[in-house]
């Protein structure tokens, strides 16, 4: 997926990180898994949203990519 396929909020933060206005997180996979886990655990959100986040987090965890 490329940034142009993402929502406006993601594109805005991408531009801010690229320009140095927002912090870059070197261990981005771990950051993404933590964020997805927070969404999946939030019982105030609709179940389908939580399930999508859990599915994405599980796939990242099982992938062979590791943050160094």
UniProtKB/Swiss-Prot annotation:
Could you tell me which cysteines form disulfide bridges? none
> InterPro entries from the entry?
UPF0253
Q: Which Pfam families match?
A: UPF0253 (PF06786)
Similarity field: Belongs to the UPF0253 family.
Name recorded for this polypeptide: UPF0253 protein VIBHAR_03255
Q: What species is this protein from? A: Vibrio campbellii (strain ATCC BAA-1116)
């Amino acid at each position: 997926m490329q940034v142009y396929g993402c929502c406006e909020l993601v594109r805005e933060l991408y531009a801010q990180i690229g320009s140095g206005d927002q912090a870059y997180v070197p261990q981005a996979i771990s950051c993404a898994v933590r964020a997805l886990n927070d969404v999946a655990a939030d019982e105030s959100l609709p179940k389908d949203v939580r399930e999508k986040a859990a599915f994405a987090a599980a796939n990242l965890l099982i992938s062979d990519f590791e943050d160094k």
